Amino acid sequence: MLPVTSRRHFTMSLYMLRSSSPHINHHSFLLPSFVSSKFKHHTLSPPPSPPPPPPMAACIDTCRTGKPQISPRDSSKHHDDESGFRYMNYFRYPDRSSFNGTQTKTLHTRPLLEDLDRDAEVDDVWAKIREEAKSDIAKEPIVSAYYHASIVSQRSLEAALANTLSVKLSNLNLPSNTLFDLFSGVLQGNPDIVESVKLDLLAVKERDPACISYVHCFLHFKGFLACQAHRIAHELWTQDRKILALLIQNRVSEAFAVDFHPGAKIGTGILLDHATAIVIGETAVVGNNVSILHNVTLGGTGKQCGDRHPKIGDGVLIGAGTCILGNITIGEGAKIGAGSVVLKDVPPRTTAVGNPARLLGGKDNPKTHDKIPGLTMDQTSHISEWSDYVI
C-alpha cells in the first residue's frame, strides 16, 4: 500500500500523462489496473514453439502454380504474393515473359530478377516521394507549407494524388473538398488505377531527363497529372457517370491544356512530355509504355460516329506536332517522327515520317528497329536515312 502523499503525487503524474498524451484512450485508462500492472510480478511463460514448415511439394505448388484470389480492397495485405504477377500484367515490354497462373506465354520480356527489382521500386514510390519531399523542405524551407500539405501530411499515395488534383482542378463553384471526396472514392475502390499511377511515375523519371525526382513529377508535371485525372474520369465514364467524367475533362483542359476524352483507353507506363495541346479522341486506345510529346492529336477524320480514332500499340513513340487521324493502327514499337501527319496503318517496329507520313525504307520493304522507341526516346536517329537535307 502506497503512503497517502505518494499516492497523491502518483495520481497527479498520471493526470499529467493523460493530459499531455492525446493518443491515450481516456475512457479505458483506469488507475487501479494501471497501478496493479506496475507493481504486480508477472510470471514469464516460455515462448511458443514455431509451427513445423510445410512439405516441400506444397511450398513449390503454392509459389509457382497458384495465384491467390483476393479482393481489391485487400490487395495491399497480399502485396508480396501479387508482386510477381502484377508487373507482368501492367508493365509489358516486347521480348518478355508473362506468367498467367499455371500458363506461360512469350511476350518478349526482361529477366525475372530485374522484374522483381523493378517491382520493389514500384512499391517504394510513395516512400521515396515522402523522403524527397522532406529533403526538399530541408533545402528550401520556403516550400515547407506547400510540401507538408501536399505530401508529408498525407497518409497514402491515393490521398496525396486526390488532394493535388482537387486543388488544381477546383474553382469557385467546384470546391476542392467535393473533388477530393470524389477522387478519393475512385482511387480507393480501384487499386489498378493506383498501380498505373506508380508505373507512370517510374516512366517519367526514367525517360525524361528534366525530371529530377518523383516528388517533382508528382507535384509539377502537368502531363502526369492530366493522365491521372483522365484515369479517374475514364472510370466514372465506364460507370455511366458521364456528366462528372465530362466535367473533369473540361477542368483538365482548362487547367493543363490537355484534352483527353474520358472514353479513351490509356495504358500504363505513359509519358506525356511537356503535354501542352495533346488531344486524344473518344474511341482512341493507347497501349503500355507509350511516350507522347506535346501538340499531338489522336483524332478522327470527320463527323462520323462510332469507332473513329487511332489505336496505338505498346512501346510507341509519337514526336511533337504529330497528327494521327482516323481508325488506324500504329503497330507495337513503331516510331512517328515529329510533325508527321499519319493517315494509314504503320507496321510494328517501323518509322513513319513526313506529311503525309511515309515509311522509312519504303512501303514494300520498310526498315525495322530492335529497340523500343517508347522507352529509348530516340527521336532523331532516322533523319539521316529519311533525308539527305543538311543545313
From Swiss-Prot:
Tissue expression: Ubiquitous with higher levels in leaves and siliques. Localized in vascular tissues, particularly in phloem.
GO molecular function per UniProt: serine O-acetyltransferase activity; zinc ion binding
Name of the featured protein: Serine acetyltransferase 3, mitochondrial
PANTHER family: SERINE ACETYLTRANSFERASE
A Gene Ontology term for the protein's cellular component: mitochondrion
Stretch list, region Disordered: 40-82, 353-375
Protein induction: By light, cadmium (Cd), and slightly by sulfur deficiency.
Compositional bias (Pro residues): 45-56
Species the sequence originates in: Arabidopsis thaliana
